[in-house]
A protein has these predicted regions:
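Short membrane-interfacial helix/loop motifs at transmembrane-helix boundaries
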Residues: 42-45, 49-88, 93-98, 152-153, ...
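C-terminal transmembrane helix and the adjacent membrane-cytosol boundary/short C-terminal tail
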Residues: 27-30, 34, 42-48, 55, ...
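C-terminal structured domain segments across diverse proteins
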Residues: 343, 358-489
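Membrane-interfacial helix termini and adjacent extracytoplasmic/periplasmic loops
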Residues: 35-38, 75-79, 83-87, 122-125, ...
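Transmembrane alpha-helices
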Residues: 53, 102, 132, 136, ...
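Interhelical loop and adjacent transmembrane-helix boundary motif
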Residues: 44, 176, 250-290, 320-324, ...
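Transmembrane-helix boundary motif in ABC transporter permease subunits
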Residues: 99-130, 143, 147, 197, ...
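Glycine/proline-centered hinge or cleavage motifs at structural transition points of membrane proteins
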Residues: 215-216, 229, 489
Length: 489
């Protein structure tokens, strides 16, 4: 190893006394200090493991409550629901998910391929503009399109004035329907598919696509048989996110009077007053979520085609004439329908009509929104840092399992979270109130139910995945040697 006999002898003696050599240089270490540091390191790992486990329990409360409801006694309300309206909930939810999956696939994959593989006027602007509809809540877009496309709206009024027809004499699609809800939700959620599939086209499909084109394949054949299969995991991942958000949607389907799981849960709880039946309905809904998670995890498995197609950049084809104009139009339509029309309509109403009472309550609205947003963000980031550092220090299977369970909340629909959290929190509040009333004659009231704390709790469970992925990506960019250097100082 390039050391002299004298240095080799000193190195052998150092193995006993605690002196360590590396490349002939002398580093003094204390064996006792190393032993103590190892013991402290084991204790630290146990602390991080326990912390990650407690966080997973904290975030899994809604799931635990819902799963335990399956073993609760059956009520008359649940018997009525399971025999009468449950098939309708299942059918409408599946039909809504199928339509949304179809629409978002067509819009997302089509625009992703055009912006990734072709060159046309406005491509650079449309590449980021196609993400804008994701910023609009689906129920707000539903309000706007209902106002525009309803019988008394400007669109049908213009049709009647131009044609002279009356109600019932012409066909116009009903916006407040299941198909209308699928259309609205698709306009808002297609960017999930667009973003993931576009990256897959650029990074994974380039080599195989160029090879197919070199061997004489037509552009459509190379896209359909080569590029699209290589991007299948990204497409399935995007669709899984879209369908989870579709399951979670309540405002759109409730406003359009479409009976789905989300509307059924709240209707069972608040209209029928049966929490147990609502929890059982949420458990059925949770089975859909689990199925989507399993499908998404299964399609993450790497394939040979994906491994081959990782290198290279996709060469864009220059479009000209009517083809280029058509590509521009196809990419402009989702932006106009999903972002510009809703945003422009709301801005027009705000400027022309407005609300005279807005100034009195607007400050309070902003304050409440900022309070909840900042509190949830701070709590989620702190918890995410704990999970990230636990993974960094230990990287054990137990910690990784705790992290996977803790970040499951992003797949939980809002209705499921509401039912799964409200039931145990309300029971806890009643138990505390009863204890203080009986023991100290103090009326505490409800400490958590109906407060900002429970809302923040729900948001943390829902969006901890986003916070963890961001912090973990940043932490992985920091070499572990920095941690060791800091501890040595």
């Amino acid at each position: 190893c390039g050391l002299s006999e004298k240095k080799l002898t000193a190195y052998r003696r150092a193995r006993i006394t605690g002196v360590t050599y590396a490349n002939g240089s002398l580093y003094y270490t204390n064996l006792t200090r190393n032993i103590r540091a190892g013991m402290q390191n084991q204790q630290t790992q146990w602390r991080w493991l326990i912390s990650s486990f407690l966080i997973s329990v904290f975030t899994l409360v809604p799931v635990i409550v819902i799963l335990t409801s399956l073993f609760a006694p059956t009520t008359s309300t649940w018997s009525h629901i399971s025999s009468s309206v449950l098939p309708g909930y299942v059918g409408n939810t599946l039909l809504l998910m199928a339509q949304v999956a179809l629409y978002t696939t067509v819009i997302g994959v089509g625009t992703a391929w055009l912006t990734a593989a072709t060159e046309f006027p406005g491509r650079r602007i449309l590449t980021w503009a196609l993400m804008l509809p994701l910023a609009a809540p689906a129920y707000i877009v539903a309000y706007v399109y209902t106002d525009l496309l309803d019988y008394s709206g400007p669109v049908q009024t213009l049709i009647r004035s131009l044609t002279g027809l009356y109600a019932g004499e012409y066909y116009f699609p009903e916006i407040r329907s299941l198909s209308g809800a699928a259309f609205i939700i698709s306009l808002v959620l297609y960017p999930y598919v667009y973003l993931l599939v576009r990256v897959a086209f650029i990074q994974r499909s380039a080599t195989l696509y160029d090879a197919a084109r070199t061997l004489g394949a037509s552009p459509f054949y190379a896209f359909w048989r080569i590029a699209l299969p290589a991007a299948r995991p990204a497409l399935v991942g995007g669709l899984a996110l879209v369908l989870m958000e579709t399951l979670a949607d309540y405002g759109t389907v409730d406003y359009f009077a479409v009976p789905t799981f989300s509307t059924g849960i709240f209707r069972t709880w608040f209209s029928m007053g049966d929490k147990a039946a609502a929890l059982k309905l949420a458990a059925v809904m949770f089975s859909f979520v689990v199925l989507l998670i399993v499908i998404e995890k299964y399609n993450r498995r790497p394939s040979q085609a994906q491994a081959i197609a990782r290198d290279g950049n996709l060469q864009r084809t220059q479009l000209t004439g009517l083809v280029a104009a058509g590509a521009t139009l196809l990419c402009v339509l989702p932006v106009v329908l999903g972002s510009l029309i809703p945003g422009g309509t709301l801005a027009y109403f705000a400027l022309t009509t407005g609300d005279p009472l807005l100034g009195h309550g607007f400050t309070g609205f902003i304050g409440n929104s900022l309070q909840v947003a900042l509190s949830a963000t701070l709590a989620a980031v702190i918890i995410a840092l704990v999970l990230t550092y636990a993974k960094r220090l230990t990287d054990s299977k137990a910690v990784n399992l705790s992290i996977q369970l803790s970040t499951l909340g992003y797949a939980l629909p809002g209705a499921l979270l509401a039912v799964g959290l409200f039931a145990p929190v309300s029971q806890f509040d009643r138990a505390i109130a009863t204890f203080f009333d009986e023991q100290f004659d103090i009326q505490t009231g409800l400490l958590l139910t109906g407060t900002v704390a429970i809302v923040v709790y729900a948001y943390v469970v829902r969006f901890l995945t986003v916070a963890f992925n961001s912090t973990n990506s940043g932490m992985e960019a920091i070499p572990p040697i920095y941690d060791q250097a800091a501890r040595s100082l």
